[in-house]
Each structure stands twice: as C-alpha cells, then as structure tokens.
C-alpha cells in the first residue's frame, strides 16, 4: 500500500527543504480557548502549514500534497477540501488520479459529508466517464452498509446527472431479495420507478409494482416498508387506489391471517377516509378483530381505531386522535347533509 | 405460509430489542411497582462530563476540529438544559473563542481561520444565545451574517452549506433558524426555500435531505421547522408526516431515524420535536383533513348527542389524558385562522405563544424511559443505544429530547409540566424547557428575541443595538 507513505515515516514540514520558505501560521485560539483539542504534534504542524498556504492562496503542487496530508488527519475539514478543489482546478490535475485519492480516504469515512461532496464534484467534472465507477463504488459501500444515507444520495445524483439507469431496477430487486426490510432499497425503487427515463413513469409501472409489493406484503405483513411503498404508488391518485382489487384482496388476506394486522388496518383506515366503499368481506374481517367492548353499530373507521388502540398500544394516542378526527369528519358530513336536505325542502 | 427469511435488518433489530429488554426487566424486577422512583438524571456526573469537554479535549477529538462551535453548542446547551451555569470566566472565554471563529465577511467557521459554514454558524449563534449575555449577543455581526446567508443561496431555492458546499435541507434550516432568531429575515432570503423543502417530502410522509432521498428524522425536523419559520408549513402534507413520524417510535420506547432502522437516542429530539411542533399546528392539520375549523363550536355542542357518546367506554383505562385529545372549540383554539400570516420575522415568537390545542401523539413517558434507562450513562453523558459509547452530540440531543417529552403535555409555553408527565422523581429529573424551533432554552430565546427586536431589521442593520448598553 503506497498510500501509507505519509503516515509511516512522516518528515515534519519544518525539516522538508521544499517548505523552508513557508512560515507556519499558528491557530488563533486566543489565550483561554473553550473546547481546546490536545492536537498531536503532527496535526498542529500540518494545520499550521495549511493555514500558511491557504492565507497566501498558493495554488501549487506542494499545496495539493499538503491538503492531502491534512485531509488524512481530519477528513471533516471542509475548508481544506474546498481549497483542494481550487488547487486541483488551477493545476489542471488528472481527476482520475484524484478519484483514487478519494477512494483511499473513503475507506473508514463512509459517513463523512465532505468526502461525498468531493466525489460529486469530481464525478460532475468527469461526466459520463464516471458513471460505471461511481455506481460500482456505491455498490461496494452497500455491500457493507446497505442503508448508507450519503451513498444513496450520491448514487441518485449520479443517475440523474450522468445516467446509468439500465440495471437500477434489477439492483433494487437484488437488494430487496437480500433484505426485504431494507427501506433504503424500497426508497430507491420508488426513485427508479418514478424518475427513470427508461421505464415510462409511475403510472406505466404501477401494475407491475403493485404485484411485486403485494407479494412482499403477503410474505411479511408486519414489514412497514412495502405498505408505505404501496401507498406511494398511488400518490396523488387515491381514486385508483380505492378501486384496485389487488389492494382489497391483500388487505383481506392479511386481516384474516394470524399475522400482525396493524399496517393492514392502518391502510384500510386510510382508504376509508378516501371514500372506499368496503366490501362485506372486509367489514366482517374487521368485525372479527373488533374488541367486544365496542358497540356493533360503531362506524367501521372507529372500529378500526379501537382495534388499533389495543393492537398497537405504543400509538394509542395517535389512534385515539384519528378516531376523534373521524368523529368530526362524520359530523361535518352529517351537517352538510342536513343543510342540503334543508335547502331541498325550501 | 412462506417462512420469513431472517435478514440483517431483523437480526440487528433483535439484538437491540434483547439488550433493551434486559435493562427494563432488571429495573422492573428491583422495583416492580414504581421503578421510575429509582431513576434520576445524574446531574453532577453529566455536568462534570460537559464542563470537562469545555475545558479540555483529547487528541481523538481532532476529527471534530472543524466542528468546534458544535462542541460549544452541544456542551453549553446541555448545561443550560440541566439548569446549571459554567460561571463568568468560562462564559467570557466561550464568547472570545466564538468571536475568533467569526469570519470577517460574516458567518462562523468550524474553528478560527476556517471558512464560514452554515451548520457551524447555527451552532455558534445558538451557543451565544445560550450564553445569553449582552456581550455574547452583540458579538454577532448581524449585518455581515445576513450577506453571508444571502451568498449561500442556491438557484434551487435551497442553501449551500459553504462556498462550493453541498445543498440540502439542513442548510435551509440552519440558515432560516439563525436569520429568524436574529431578526434578519427578508423575502429575498426565504424566496424558493419552501419549494425546495416541499420537493424533499417523500412518499413515506417524512422529509429527506435532498429530493428523491429517503425520509429521515433529522431532515424531517429541519424541513418542518424551516417551513414553520417561513410560514409555509401548510404546503407540506401534514397528515402524511404525522403518520410517518408516530411510526418511528419503536418497541424500545425511543425513536428510530428511518423506517426499519435501529432506535437511537438522538432521535428523541429530532422526531420528538417533530411531534411537539405538530401539536401547535392543529388548525392547519384540520384544514388539510378537510375539517373546517369554524365548525368547532357546533361539534362541541353535538358531541353530547347520542351517536357519539359510546366514545368514552373504550377510552377508559387507556390513558387518563385521552379525553383531552380533541379539544376543538376550546378557548383559544380558533382565535386565529390557520391562513393568518404573522410577520415572517416573528414566526418563532408567534408559534411558541400559540395555545397547544392538541395532545402529544407519541408515548412521551416511554420515550423518557428509553433516554433515562438506555441512553444515560452512569458516569455522565448519553449515548445512541446500549452498547455504544457516550458523546457530546448524543448528550445534547438526548437531553433536548427528554425536555421535549417532559413538556409535551403542557398547555402553553412557560407552564411547568405536571409530575405525572415526568418520568422519575420530579425535582430530580425536570429539565429546562426549549424553544422547539431553535432548540435553545426558552428563556434564552426570549432574551435573544428582545435583543434582536431592539436591533433594526434588515436594511439598514444596526450594529450597535441599545440593549447591549444596559
Ligand atoms: Zn444518534
């Protein structure tokens, strides 16, 4: 590993002949700083020299090398990164070399904003040439941490700015096969289905996606991710959602199974609030789950909230609130009806 | 029935659940009737850990060398939440240090001589507000800060973290937060911000860091708070957001940051504060649910009538509070219309003075239990979850979240919570109250507002406000 040369036998800047002309600039911490950090000798010295070239705005090869050393000591220093970009541009350095540098730093710092931002800057400069490499790189990150937020943002940016959509849906599929609970993969799936220029958009993809999602729900009804995804497939089109027979059928299947009913009930409640006319089967499935203390004449929506108050005690206050909202919605429609009747009579 | 495949998500989740259950079982075994009596905030230990951090940090903190205003904020805000004080000398040292982080062209960097950055600007400004002295507030160059904020504006409507930096919802929040609290907001600054944040609300209901990304607790707080501050919160899908956030509280009692991720103490604030903010948005929520707010008196009258009176039976035994859950038509709830727009510059003040017409939609006691039993470390400090180490970030946000949970049942700002709403012995556990939009202690917010109001608004900005001379 040639990248270790710096850390292995570091020669202090003050002993390096090519730095003899530079006067280090100490940090202006004041006489009694708060949150003072007990820097190592190497750290202090490197930063003192960095300040010197930063203040002098020296865009040179040695400045580039110095920023590299400073970044290895603290990859979170955005000032160093920003100055490095300035120097890179001034020197016209081959940015593929720069990518190798970032790869070396990235290893232990997959949650660092600066590195990802620098990668994005690089990929933007490299253009279409960077696509394969960036998609592979993020894949490698996901093999260790499939939910890495920065890596997903980066991947989405690459797809949108530079392309590479061809295999993305298959990749989501594969990640979900590995772990159907991986919500980041579901989110990416939504991203691809709604934004890929190759797939025709959400409406065109909907039927296929509903099939897939309904299967995932049947396999693990307690998994929140596919339920939210299913709702997302009908974003801004609840009319179609309410009419989808596949949805009604998966709801019935789950409600009559031994599995957790929480998400199915939540989903059904949502549908009812969007004027779903429930089938007799669904009504009876809910009745079976309704606590005996409930009056049988209670509205279906309120029954569902009552079941959820028991089945999901963590959110009892939420379900209670939902029930109270249903109550008012009901009252308002009654009032509206009454007013309508009045005006008819008049 | 297909058998459920055990995946990494499930395995990780089970490990955490087991650890947490062991802790709860232990506490309930030593005191089955009132385990919370045994719990308290280790105030002295936390104070020791925090003031130690202010005075000296080891070499391992070098990786936070570009986040020193954050270290100030995490420690100073935590100390303020505990109701402790660090003394005049250390306070002056903090003001002096932060002044050295202030850029000559406005904003604060991660340390002396570093470029100004929005996140560290937020941390520095909140630190100075927490210090609260006139010298602290007057050390902020408001005029230059305004030009820095304007310089960070991006064509997308969002903000950039620093010159050449990344654009995301965090940047929007930190910019809007400092602008609001320092009374330097104007139309130019907020133009397009609402569109940007709106484009980050996902199909799940929460808010992501960038358009297309996954809904996330930290960004959801930032997005919601910023939308409230620019008075455009009615543009978000609030019922969807509520439904997402209440499902982030897990069986452990604490919150997770994203769907199917692990519980983490810091989300006690990020997610807890989202629910807390929503409690003051009931009028807009009703509007979005298609409920007209002026119907409230009618519904209050009608609610005594037959069809609704079966309500009470299943409320009993669930919670002593639930009858209060829906106080539509209570005094104050309808005094102002949801579309009424306060002066943008004072949305933070108007917001905190709204009556809280909605009860918390999360389990605030259970959240407190998680923070105190699972995140708190006996020797001082707080952590993400059992098995992890303490740090200043988690200490700050666990304490902030604890405060949010403790005050979530209060009716209005400035009123103390009832003992039954505070987990553990009241006097030992009760923290100071925060302003949920800025996450600074409420009293310090009022002082800062008084100061900022005394300064002139954007153009021309006064550099010598009268307040500092008293
Ligand atoms: Zn955390």
From Swiss-Prot, chain A:
Function statement: Essential subunit of both the farnesyltransferase and the geranylgeranyltransferase complex. Contributes to the transfer of a farnesyl or geranylgeranyl moiety from farnesyl or geranylgeranyl diphosphate to a cysteine at the fourth position from the C-terminus of several proteins having the C-terminal sequence Cys-aliphatic-aliphatic-X.
Subunit composition and interactions: Heterodimer of an alpha and a beta subunit.
One Gene Ontology term of the molecular function aspect: CAAX-protein geranylgeranyltransferase activity
Keyword Repeat in annotation: yes
Keyword Transferase: yes
Per-repeat ranges for PFTA: 59-93, 94-128, 130-164, 165-198, 205-239
Name of the encoding gene: FTA
Name of the featured protein: Protein farnesyltransferase/geranylgeranyltransferase type-1 subunit alpha
Origin: domain of life: Eukaryota
Catalytic activity, as annotated: L-cysteinyl-[protein] + (2E,6E)-farnesyl diphosphate = S-(2E,6E)-farnesyl-L-cysteinyl-[protein] + diphosphate; geranylgeranyl diphosphate + L-cysteinyl-[protein] = S-geranylgeranyl-L-cysteinyl-[protein] + diphosphate
Enzyme Commission number(s): 2.5.1.58, 2.5.1.59
Cofactor field: Mg(2+)
GO biological process: peptide pheromone maturation; protein farnesylation; protein geranylgeranylation
Pfam families the UniProt entry points to: PPTA
Family: Belongs to the protein prenyltransferase subunit alpha family.
Gene Ontology cellular component annotations, sorted alphabetically: CAAX-protein geranylgeranyltransferase complex; cytoplasm; protein farnesyltransferase complex
Record keywords: Magnesium, Prenyltransferase, Repeat, Transferase
């Amino acid at each position: 590993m040639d990248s270790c040369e710096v850390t292995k036998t570091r020669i202090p800047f003050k002993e390096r002949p090519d730095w003899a002309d530079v006067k280090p600039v100490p940090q202006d911490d004041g006489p009694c700083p708060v949150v003072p950090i007990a820097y190592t000798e190497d750290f202090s010295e490197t930063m003192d020299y960095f300040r010197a070239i930063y203040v002098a705005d020296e865009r040179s090869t040695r400045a580039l090398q110095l920023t590299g050393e400073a970044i290895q000591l603290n990859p979170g220093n955005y000032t160093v990164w920003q100055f490095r970009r300035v120097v890179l541009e001034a020197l016209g350095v081959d940015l593929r070399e720069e990518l190798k540098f970032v790869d070396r730093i990235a290893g232990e710092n997959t949650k660092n904003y600066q590195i990802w931002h620098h990668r994005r800057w690089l990929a933007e400069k490299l253009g279409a040439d960077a696509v394969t490499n960036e998609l592979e790189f993020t894949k490698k990150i996901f093999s260790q941490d499939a939910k890495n937020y920065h890596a997903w943002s980066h991947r989405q940016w690459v797809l949108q700015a530079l392309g590479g959509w061809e295999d993305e849906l298959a990749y989501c599929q594969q990640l979900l096969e590995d772990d159907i609970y991986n919500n980041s993969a579901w989110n990416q799936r939504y991203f691809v289905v709604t934004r890929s220029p190759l797939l025709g958009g959400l409406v065109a993809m909907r039927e296929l996606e509903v099939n897939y999602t309904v299967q995932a729900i049947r396999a693990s009804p307690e998994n929140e991710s596919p339920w939210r995804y299913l709702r997302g497939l009908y974003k801004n089109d609840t009319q179609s959602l309410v009419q989808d027979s596949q949805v009604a059928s998966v709801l019935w299947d789950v409600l009559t199974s031994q599995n957790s009913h929480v998400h199915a009930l939540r989903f059904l409640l949502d549908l009812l609030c969007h004027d779903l006319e429930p089938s007799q089967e669904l009504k009876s499935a809910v009745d079976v789950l309704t606590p005996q203390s409930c009056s049988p004449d209670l509205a279906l929506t309120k029954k569902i909230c009552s079941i959820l108050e028991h089945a999901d005690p963590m959110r009892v206050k939420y379900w209670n609130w939902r029930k109270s909202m249903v109550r008012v919605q009901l009252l308002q429609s009654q009032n509206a009806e009454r007013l309508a009747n009045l005006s008819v009579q008049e | 029935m297909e058998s459920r495949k055990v995946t990494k998500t499930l395995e990780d989740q089970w490990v955490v659940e087991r650890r947490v259950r062991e802790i709860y079982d232990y506490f309930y075994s030593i005191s089955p009737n009132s385990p919370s009596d045994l719990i308290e905030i280790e105030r002295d230990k936390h104070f020791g850990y925090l003031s130690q951090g202010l005075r000296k940090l080891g070499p391992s903190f070098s990786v936070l060398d570009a986040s020193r205003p954050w270290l100030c904020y995490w420690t100073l805000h935590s100390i303020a939440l505990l109701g402790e004080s660090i003394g005049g000398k250390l306070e002056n040292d903090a003001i002096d240090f932060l002044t050295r982080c202030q850029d000559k062209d406005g904003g604060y960097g991660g340390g002396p001589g570093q470029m100004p950055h929005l996140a560290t600007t937020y941390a520095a400004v909140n630190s100075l507000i927490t210090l609260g002295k006139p010298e602290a507030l007057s050390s902020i160059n408001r005029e230059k800060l305004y030009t820095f904020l304007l310089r960070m504006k991006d064509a997308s409507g969002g903000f950039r973290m620093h010159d050449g930096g990344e654009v995301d919802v965090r940047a929007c929040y930190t910019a809007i937060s400092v602008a609001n609290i320092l009374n330097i907001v104007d139309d130019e600054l907020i133009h397009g911000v609402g569109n940007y944040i709106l484009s980050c609300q996902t199909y799940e209901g929460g808010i992501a860091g960038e358009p297309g990304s996954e809904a996330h607790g930290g960004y959801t707080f930032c997005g919601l708070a910023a939308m409230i501050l620019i008075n455009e919160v009615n543009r978000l899908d609030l019922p969807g957001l509520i439904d997402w956030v209440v499902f982030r509280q897990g069986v452990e009692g604490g919150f997770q940051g994203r769907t199917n991720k692990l519980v983490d103490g810091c989300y006690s604030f990020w997610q807890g504060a989202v629910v807390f903010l929503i409690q003051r948005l009931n009028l807009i929520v009703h509007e979005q649910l298609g409920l007209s707010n002026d119907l409230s008196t009618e519904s209050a009258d009608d609610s005594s009538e037959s069809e609704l009176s079966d309500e009470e039976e299943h409320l009993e035994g669930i919670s002593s509070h639930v009858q209060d859950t829906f106080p539509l038509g209570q005094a104050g709830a309808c005094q102002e219309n949801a579309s009424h727009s306060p002066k943008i510059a004072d949305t933070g003040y108007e917001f905190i003075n709204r009556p809280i017409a909605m009860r918390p939609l999360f389990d605030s006691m259970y959240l407190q239990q998680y923070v105190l039993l699972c995140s708190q470390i006996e020797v001082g400090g707080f952590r993400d979850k059992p098995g992890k180490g303490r740090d200043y970030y988690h200490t700050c946000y666990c304490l902030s979240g604890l405060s949010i949970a403790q005050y979530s049942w209060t009716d209005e700002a400035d009123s103390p919570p009832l003992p039954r709403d505070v987990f553990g012995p009241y006097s030992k556990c009760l923290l100071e109250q925060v302003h949920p939009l800025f996450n600074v202690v409420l009293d310090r917010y009022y002082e800062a507002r008084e100061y900022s109001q005394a300064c002139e608004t954007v153009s021309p900005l006064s550099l010598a406000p009268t307040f500092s001379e008293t």
